[in-house]
Amino acid sequence: IKDEDLLRLIDMECFCWSVMPADRTPMINAGMVFSDRHAGGINYPKGGVGVIAEKLVAGLEANGGEIRYKHRVTNVLIEQGQAVGVRLADGEELRAKRIVSNATRWDTFAGEGSAQSTLVGPEHTPAAETTWRKRYQPSSSFLSLHLGVDASVVPKGFHCHHLLLEDWAEMEAEQGVVFVSMPSLLDPSLAPAGRHILHTFTQSDMRHWKGLSPSAYAEKKQHDADRLIDRLEALLPGLKSAIEFKEIGTPRTHRRFLGRMGGSYGPVPANRLPGLLPMPFNRTGLKNLYCVGDSCFPGQGLNAVAFSGYACSHRIGADLGLNPWSLPA
């Protein structure tokens, strides 16, 4: 491919999935992007994306499982070199035959670049985690806005999704690409009559939000949100005056409420890697402890993370002798 505009478009499409340009996005992930967005089209769950989580919960509970909300795990319990359970913030201990961490590897294992408090201490962190840290680094987080707007500002024929970038050279820059989604265009039940929901976000690194006093943080939060809204006026003239509800999320918001180091979207290669092969599968070097999510094969993105969960369930089933076949270790 020689056409510069087409190459930039491919970079942008890959960036939407992996927050990396095409030359650092594994082919399998890039294939999912173009298949989903151009060949098969996209789908929204009726009732909002939260319906996916609700259905998963219903399935787990129907099979005898239990979910405890607002119960923070502080440690993985390790005895005789193997994981045997978890300790909660209130001191309660829960034990099981197999333990699964859906936290990032920086939040799960101690080591260089890890979160201040990890689930597994340095004395039990496998050596392979040091190698992983040399290959991957955390991507940036996001500045996100959830807006409730008067429907009169939305022109007829407005699309559900938009990407806004004024300068191709700024694609990977702080607050470069603006992602816009208006799901109430497809599912009017998501918003009151005469209103629309607008979700917009742009990449933002934690280093720009550190060391701020409460007043300075509030000021930057509002300033950056206003600047983002100003940019959106190119798509929706009059947007600012049509906003009736506004909720702002920053990298600090994502760190606090999602439990992710630096609010990171996930791992990206520190250097160019040979595809997905260096990305570990679900087993870890600590017996009976598994990892799942974007720190495992096949990486970032909803489809990829869902696959890692599917793979992990089969891996554990095989290790427990519950299914006759398994995916790679």
What are these regions (language model features)?
Residues 1-53:
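Conserved redox-cofactor binding core of oxidoreductases
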Residues 7-18, 175, 179, 238-298:
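A glycine-rich dinucleotide-binding beta-alpha-beta segment and adjacent secondary-structure elements
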Residues 33-89:
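Helical element adjacent to the flavin cofactor pocket in flavoenzyme catalytic cores
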Residues 66, 70, 238-247, 323-327:
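Flexible, glycine/charged-enriched surface loops at secondary-structure junctions
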Residues 150-255:
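C-terminal segments that line or cap access tunnels to active or ligand-binding sites in enzymes
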Residues 294-317:
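A conserved FAD-binding loop/helix module that cradles the flavin
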